[in-house]
């Protein structure tokens, strides 16, 4: 993924996040609670038909937790304050993300034992996925008030408009010009 302004590669550490004009319309503030559980161990997930990115991130809580980690959130209480999720579901999702090596735990308090949750390299590599989904949402799920989150590329100072490009020719990828191989 590259910045369309300066054409440099962009990592999650190269970007700052700011609330945009559409932030007040974030549907996560609606306190809807549903009970659901995802298998939290590889063995349990191995019993499912598919074990892939969609199974890991297709759950709204897991995807939101990872997105918040890119914003600098790293404690259970901080995730819980931001998301209207039941504590047992949040604990389950954090356990899943640690088991899948998306997060690693670092103790910050001994009694009672509490952890900071940090993105691993594997987790940080999900950044282009989230930026691409944000761009899609900004285009197709607009409320008319503007984007809820604005990204700035720290290196060049421009608003980030990321492009996924071919690693061979450097051109932006167009869905009709990409073929998937099995």
Please place each PLM-identified region on the residue numbering.
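C-terminal regulatory/oligomerization modules of transcriptional regulators
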Residues: 1-34, 142-182
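Short, Lys/Arg-enriched N-terminal segment that forms or immediately precedes the first helix
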Residues: 30-54
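N-terminal helix-turn-helix DNA-binding core of bacterial DNA-binding proteins
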Residues: 48-89
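Short, hydrophobic-biased segments on the C-terminal half of alpha helices
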Residues: 94-95
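Amphipathic, soluble alpha-helical interaction motifs
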Residues: 100, 136-139
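Beta-hairpin "wing" of winged helix-turn-helix
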Residues: 100-113
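Basic, amphipathic "hinge/linker" alpha-helix immediately C-terminal to the N-terminal HTH DNA-binding motif
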Residues: 111-130
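Globin-like tetrapyrrole-binding proteins
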Residues: 133
């Amino acid at each position: 993924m590259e910045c369309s302004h300066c054409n440099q590669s962009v990592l999650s550490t190269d970007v700052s996040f700011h609330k945009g004009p559409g932030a007040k319309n974030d549907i996560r503030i609606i306190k809807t609670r549903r009970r659901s559980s995802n298998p939290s161990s590889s063995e349990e997930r191995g019993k499912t038909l598919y074990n892939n990115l969609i199974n890991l991130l297709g759950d709204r809580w897991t995807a939101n937790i990872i997105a918040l980690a890119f914003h600098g959130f790293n404690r259970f209480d901080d995730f819980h304050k931001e998301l209207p999720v039941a504590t047992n579901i949040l604990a389950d999702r954090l356990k899943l993300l640690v088991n899948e090596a998306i997060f690693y735990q670092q103790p910050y308090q001994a009694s009672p034992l509490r952890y900071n949750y940090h993105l691993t390299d594997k987790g940080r590599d999900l950044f282009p996925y989230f930026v691409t989904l944000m761009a899609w949402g900004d285009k197709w799920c607009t409320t008319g008030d503007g984007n809820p989150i604005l990204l700035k590329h720290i290196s060049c100072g421009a608003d980030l408009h990321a492009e996924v490009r071919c690693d061979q020719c450097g051109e932006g990828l167009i869905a009709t010009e990409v073929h998937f191989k099995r």
